[in-house]
């Protein structure tokens, strides 16, 4: 029996919701835990979990982009129409990212420097990724060709990241332009807490390649097998990257595993692919769609809850004193944020239906 379109898309919303929860816990513990609590095992695992929300959001943006593109192609839209539609949406997200920076700058007065207006954040890079993917789809027409091109671009971005952060830095560019390449911002070296094109766009293009695979005729007819294949491939990719990283030789003059390594990119991508397969199985056979699913609900309003929660965790209206709480206190705050964002999401959905 074939799954309905709603069932097919639920696991993508569920994955976005999971990314939201991982984002909440990362931000809450990072903002609120005291210096002594930051030495706890909880904080260590929280930071490790914090390496996945951005890859998930970008990867899922790539899949959604492929779904939209495939829908337009099935409607026999021209290549030019597809490019205009997708690039326009990417530009809208990029503009929202700029607006978000303006909001944070104004709410951060009198302490926030004007340079924060030009900080490269996750919304900026999602918008840029979508515009770049739109341009790629104009050059590579056809599903198979587009999938191969997207996978190739993801690989090239991952491989080019280490030198663009170190030995091949485009230092002649103004800092606000170089920051989109390697996240240097106003500092002497690239900053790992920013979201430049290298390496972050690679996750979006990887998602685009996966999305085109999932929209193929074979994958539509054998969806469970297709997701299982992706999950197994992801596990194999992560294992292979771990093996490569253990080798003593390196092709890069400067090697930074946690921030620029192609191996770390491949490990995270492999885990994300396995999570995608797991999310699909959970929504199809598990409790993911037994009645109301908080993760699916959050996933459908991920932009809204991202936008709102930041100010109540990191901003002027933080519900707890920053860097002053025990693990228990910060965990209670996390529960409050999760509940509030879920209620906000439900309220937004109800208003949309009226």
Kindly give the residue locations of the regions a language model identified.
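Alpha-helical transmembrane segments and their immediate juxtamembrane cytosolic regions
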Residues: 1-354
